[in-house]
Amino acid sequence: MEALAALAATAGIETRVADLENAAWPLGERSFGAIVVTNYLHRPLFPRIVAAIAGNGVLIYETFAAGNERFGKPSNPDFLLRPGELLDVVAGKFRVIAYEDLQIGEPKPAMVQRICAMRSGVGP
């Protein structure tokens, strides 16, 4: 958090600690030019994340996918994306720039799904 706070001070980035799963959505109706999510999956947040991306904003999302149970944790299907799930999340609202559903070898073997998508139009 210290490194992030230092970056925020110089780059105009706002940092926030929030419980995204058990508390109210902490960002209200705000929208952002970009949202990056890594190694995290709580499906009920998908609509909130999508709605929080401004017109022509970008979503970059990468997390573990089905098949990862072969390599270790996470292995619970609740924490693994289903095939094509990120494509479904952005369908009809975003233009997909890049998408992968694959096995990686570094930093350790894992199945991941990743997407970079741009919101079409001027707003949510």
Residue ranges and their predicted role:
Residues 101-124:
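Core SAM-dependent methyltransferase catalytic element
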Residues 77-93, 97-100:
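Short alpha-helix
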Residues 69-85, 106-108:
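Acceptor-substrate binding/catalytic loop of class I
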Residues 56-69:
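Conserved beta-strand signature within the Rossmann-like core of class I S-adenosyl-L-methionine
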